[in-house]
Swiss-Prot record:
Keywords of this entry: Lyase, Magnesium, Manganese, Metal-binding, Riboflavin biosynthesis
Binding site for D-ribulose 5-phosphate: 42-43, 47, 155-159, 179
Record flagged with keyword Magnesium: yes
Function description: Catalyzes the conversion of D-ribulose 5-phosphate to formate and 3,4-dihydroxy-2-butanone 4-phosphate.
Record gene name: ribB
Residues holding Mg(2+) 2: 43, 158
Site (Essential for catalytic activity): 141, 179
Similarity-based family: Belongs to the DHBP synthase family.
Protein name, per record: 3,4-dihydroxy-2-butanone 4-phosphate synthase
Keyword Secreted set for record: no
Subunit structure of this chain's protein: Homodimer.
HAMAP family, sorted: RibB
Enzyme Commission designation: 4.1.99.12
Residues holding Mg(2+) 1: 43
């Protein structure tokens, strides 16, 4: 179960899931971020996610300012294959098999690559229709993640959740995320997460809720199905 139990006891989950999901999809369509939480016995993390299609420089600055600074671009395998981005390591021994590729930078239009403007430029280059390997270089300051086929029905990760939500919103199946952190460097959870969500006016969803929603509708996680499963 998620760190903040999805009952009316927590203001994050005071509204029914269907209501929060519709609000979240509306926010993603206009470029606003959404909080996505995983299970308590997994990473126990709250990530700030945004649809890559709608990413803006101010939102990127928010991800960097309020998160860990490690901004990830979550993409389906076919997009990463077209960009010819290999895995970061040959043998992935991380606890949850998080599928990092080599980091990237836009080939053109960036300076150091680390500013909010430069990271947005890199992400736009990577998700552009027809983007190819020559449009990005490695290493860089954006960290692509390979979403597993089947989305959260296959792997209960933020990577898959962000791609699934973008597809549910009718957008390109590509998400951008960063783990939320407190000012003291600890992960943002519990009461501090509730305060942050209230201050920023953000919707929160849990991955287990999203998976249950998709299972109930018989979705397989394919982007075309997700676009009509909301």
């Amino acid at each position: 179960m998620s760190n903040v139990v999805p009952t009316p006891v927590s203001p994050l989950f005071a509204q029914p899931f269907a209501t929060r999901l519709e609000r979240a999809l509306q926010h993603l369509r206009i470029g606003r971020p959404v909080i996505l939480m995983d299970d308590f016995d997994r990473e126990n993390e709250a990530d700030l996610i945004v649809a890559a299609d709608k990413l803006t420089v101010p939102v990127m600055a928010q991800l960097i300012r309020d998160g860990s600074g490690i901004v990830c671009l979550c993409l389906p395998g076919e997009t990463l294959d077209r960009l010819e981005l290999p895995p970061m390591v040959d043998s992935n021994r991380s606890r949850y098999s998080t599928a990092f590729t080599v980091s990237i930078e836009a080939r053109e239009g960036v300076t150091t690559g680390v500013s909010a403007v430069d990271r947005v430029t890199t992400i736009r280059a990577a998700i552009a229709p027809g983007a190819r390997s020559g449009d990005v270089v490695s290493p860089g300051h954006v960290f692509p993640l390979r979403a597993q086929p089947g989305g959260v029905l296959t792997r209960r990760g933020h990577t898959e959740g962000s791609v699934d939500l973008a597809a549910l919103a009718g957008l390109r199946p590509a998400g951008v995320l960063c783990e939320l952190m407190n000012a003291d460097g600890t992960m943002m959870r519990g009461a501090s997460l509730e305060r942050y969500a209230a201050k920023e006016g953000l919707v929160a969803l849990a991955i287990d809720e999203l998976a249950a929603h998709l299972q109930a509708r018989g979705a397989t996680g394919a982007p075309a199905e997700l676009a009509v499963a909301a």
